[in-house]
Swiss-Prot record:
Lineage: Eukaryota, Metazoa, Chordata, Craniata, Vertebrata
Name recorded for this polypeptide: Nuclear receptor coactivator 5
Residues that bear Phosphothreonine: 3, 274, 379
Region (Transcription activation): 458-579
Keyword Transcription: yes
Length: 579
């Protein structure tokens, strides 16, 4: 039986649809991942999704919305405020506006992007204004807030009102400086013109050539120069006259003799720069030479002179502005402003805050200088102030030694020489009379104290000293009289070495030397004498100045006093006074 060849049955259909075949070329594609086997019904038993959700199963790990188009590898939250296009790592917590490279060696990762030192950072003006107001209200209620700290460290910018006031003050000072500069420039210019030497000196050797010399002088004056005629005497030579003219500062000198008059010529001497002498020049050529060199002289020397005048005027104007700023201008009232550093210390002192010793010394020194400046300005404004400069070292030393030696001359015990209240102000005549009577009483007490028994008891070892003290210069007595009490208190050593000038010995007034040691310091205390005259009083010092400057009578009294003190019986406390 012939049977037909059987055909093989068709192969089982591939369960993958179109495009899902196992193509090795497409399997290795980086774009398409490895194929996944899915059931025919499109649903996996372990997949609880709806069959209509066509998303990739890998997206199930990210609980995002289906419209979230970000990369599946970006695990940032939906609520992240950063831009979707920001490709930096999500662990980077920097500000999104910070585009600085972390690989930069100068990059500071701990520095805030909003730091005010960064030029990229600009704070808004309205926010800054409200912040400053809140900060001010907060700090005003703070009991520990230092309101003087931020005022001078420059951290807070000044307000618009203070800036406008500062600009107005600067403009006012600039106008005042210009005005003062013009005034000082004109004043110095007039002084320079008055002190400027003549431009040309015409030296006339013989008086017979006076008319010719005057004609030459007129031609020189027509060139714009100041001319002076000099007629030589028989005692003065021509070379000496030329030397005097050059020393006086004249740039030109023209010599006229009889030969010059005959030949209508002259000798021109140029003194400035390199000295030149042009002998027997014709008059016309001499005028051309003088005019040319005078222009050069004006260009060189007058320009330097103008610069010097401008420099002095500017310096004087600046000094005047500084003085007005310290004193305070007429629109600022009588009191001027203090320096910022001193003003802060004064404010702290006014608020009863703590100040160190150095800060207190700064305030004291500043106030002392300000007081001296005010007193100096007030004394300069007086019509006829009495100058205390003629009082040299000798008169000042005599004033120092006089009160300290007066209780010793009066023969009183030291405890009775306590300072009394200052006498009421009297007239200058009464003060002068008191001072003169004080000198007279000094001579009387010098004679009477030598006969007192208390001094006679200890006068034996001191007679040689009195003569030696009178022969010593006054500088020695001053230096020894101002010795410290630790040296003067050594009674035994002083007595063995021999008494020194100004150091009272052990037998004086019957008291030991250790008790008299503080008496040597009375030169600096300037006590009131027994006559009631306070030598610290300015009127008393003024009367003393008048007596010292005016008088033979005072010098006569002083000579009498020193003659009485030069005797061997004079006590040790009497000093020589040299005026």
């Amino acid at each position: 039986m012939n049977t037909a060849p059987s055909r093989p049955s068709p192969t089982r259909r591939d369960p993958y649809g179109f495009g899902d075949s196992r193509d090795s070329r497409r399997d290795r594609s980086p774009i398409r991942g490895s194929p996944r086997r899915e059931p025919r019904d499109g649903r996996n038993g372990r997949d609880a999704r709806d069959s209509r959700d066509i998303r990739d199963p890998r997206d199930l790990r990210d609980h995002r919305h289906s419209r979230d188009l970000r990369d599946h590898r970006d695990s940032r939250s939906v609520r992240d405020v950063r831009d979707v296009r920001d490709l930096r790592d999500f662990r980077d917590l920097r500000d999104s506006r910070d585009f600085r490279d972390q690989r930069d060696p100068m990059y500071d990762r701990y520095r805030d992007m909003r730091d005010s030192r960064d030029p990229m950072y600009r704070r808004e003006g309205s926010y800054d204004r409200y912040l400053r107001m809140d900060d001010y209200c907060r700090r005003k209620d703070d009991s520990y807030f230092d309101r003087y700290r931020d005022s001078f460290d420059g951290r807070g910018p000044p307000g618009p009102e203070s800036q406008s006031r500062a600009k107005e003050r600067l403009k006012r000072e600039e106008r005042r400086r210009e005005e003062l500069y013009r005034q000082y420039f004109e004043e110095i210019q007039r002084r320079f013109d008055a002190e400027r030497p003549v431009d040309c000196s015409v030296i006339v050797v013989n008086k017979q050539t006076k008319d010719y010399a005057e004609s030459v002088g007129r031609k020189v004056r027509d060139l714009g120069m100041v001319v002076d005629l000099i007629f030589l005497n028989t005692e003065v030579s021509l070379s000496q006259a030329l030397e005097d003219v050059s020393r006086g500062g004249s740039p030109f000198a023209i010599v006229i003799t009889q030969q010059h008059q005959i030949h209508r010529s002259c000798t021109v001497n140029i003194m400035f720069g390199t000295p030149q002498e042009h002998r027997n020049m014709p008059q016309a050529d001499a005028m051309v030479l003088v005019a040319r060199n005078y222009e050069r002289y004006k260009n060189e020397c007058r320009e330097k002179e103008r610069e010097e005048i401008a420099r002095q005027a500017a310096k004087m104007a600046d000094e005047a502005i500084l003085q007005e700023r310290e004193r305070g201008g007429p629109e600022e009232g009588v009191r001027g402003g203090h320096p910022p550093a001193i003003q802060s210390l004064i404010n702290l002192l006014a608020d009863n805050r703590y100040l160190t010793a150095e800060e207190t010394d700064k305030i004291i020194n500043y106030l002392r200088e300000r007081k001296e400046r005010l007193m100096r300005s007030s004394t300069d404004s007086l019509p006829g102030p009495i100058s205390r400069q003629p009082l040299g070292a000798t008169s000042g030393a005599s004033l120092k030694t006089q009160p300290s030696s007066q209780p010793l001359q009066s023969g009183q015990v030291l405890p009775s020489a306590t300072p009394t209240p200052s006498a009421p102000p009297t007239s200058q005549q009464e003060l002068q009379a008191k001072i003169l009577s004080l000198f007279n009483s000094g001579t009387v007490t010098a004679n009477s104290s030598s006969a007192s028994p208390s001094v006679a008891a200890g006068n034996t070892p001191n007679q040689n000293f009195s003569t030696a003290a009178n022969s010593q210069p006054q500088q020695r007595s001053q230096a020894s009289g101002n010795q410290p009490p630790s040296i003067l208190g050594q009674g035994g050593s002083a007595q063995n070495m021999g008494p020194r000038p100004g150091a009272p010995s052990q037998g004086l007034f019957g008291q030991p030397s250790s008790r008299l040691a503080p008496a040597s310091n009375m030169t600096s205390q300037r006590p009131v004498s027994s006559t009631g005259i306070n030598f610290d009083n300015p009127s008393v010092q003024k009367a003393l100045d008048t007596l010292i400057q005016s008088g033979p009578a005072l010098s006569h009294l002083v000579s009498q006093t020193t003659a009485q003190m030069g005797q061997p019986q004079a006590p040790m406390g009497s000093y020589q006074r040299h005026y």
